[in-house]
A protein has these predicted regions:
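Hydrophobic alpha-helical and helix-loop surface patches within well-folded domains
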Residues: 1-188
Length: 189
């Protein structure tokens, strides 16, 4: 868009997003509109990846956290007060927050679940193996499972095919006597 060509870096992530469509949208593309997260969720993830490569891991984490908060607070409201799975989003909401933002959150989670080495290696291999073909979530799941040796069926069932988000509740952290408490939640394979 012309408004983004303004001589500053204000819109650099928009450019990263649009350039990523050379891979997620052109090299491979979703087989149906209901699988648009494969184009747009990966493009938003690519914005975050661009941020990491240019500004470092902390900037990446900040971008991911901001995106996750956006998903938790606003995605359902923007998508007609509906909680959708990222796969099989109704066509009316194809270009909604679930597709873009929740899709990116799931890709980030998949990266953490697989680990960087396997994730990037297998994703690159997937793109090469399926170039110029329509794809769907099951194809991605099966390919990444075979490539990595990690059974991703449960991951895709929980994160791709089910609506909503994980919810955590902390009931009691005890008396901290004025100290700050940190709670770390880690997802394991």
């Amino acid at each position: 868009p012309l408004f983004a060509v303004n001589g500053t870096t204000t819109w650099e992530t928009l450019f990263a997003h649009e350039l990523s469509h050379h891979w997620w949208g052109d090299l491979v593309t979703c087989s149906t509109p209901q699988e648009m997260w494969l184009n747009e969720g990966w493009a938003v993830f690519s914005e975050h990846l661009f941020t990491e490569l240019l500004y470092g891991a902390e900037a990446y984490q900040d971008a991911v956290r901001a995106n996750n908060l956006d998903v938790l607070h606003y995605a359902a409201a923007r998508d007609g007060n509906n909680y959708f799975a990222i796969s099989n989003v109704p066509e009316t909401f194809t270009y909604g927050a679930t597709t873009y933002n929740k899709g990116a959150s799931v890709v980030h989670t998949l990266r953490g679940y697989m680990g960087d080495e396997l994730f990037f290696s297998c994703v690159t291999s997937f793109l090469n193996a399926h170039k110029f073909q329509p794809i769907n979530a099951a194809m991605l799941r099966d390919y990444l499972s075979d490539c990595s040796g990690i059974n991703l069926n449960d991951f895709f069932t929980d994160w791709v095919y089910q609506p909503g988000s994980l919810a955590f509740e902390i009931e009691d952290i005890g008396n901290t006597k004025g100290l700050t408490s940190s709670i770390c939640i880690e997802q394991k394979k």
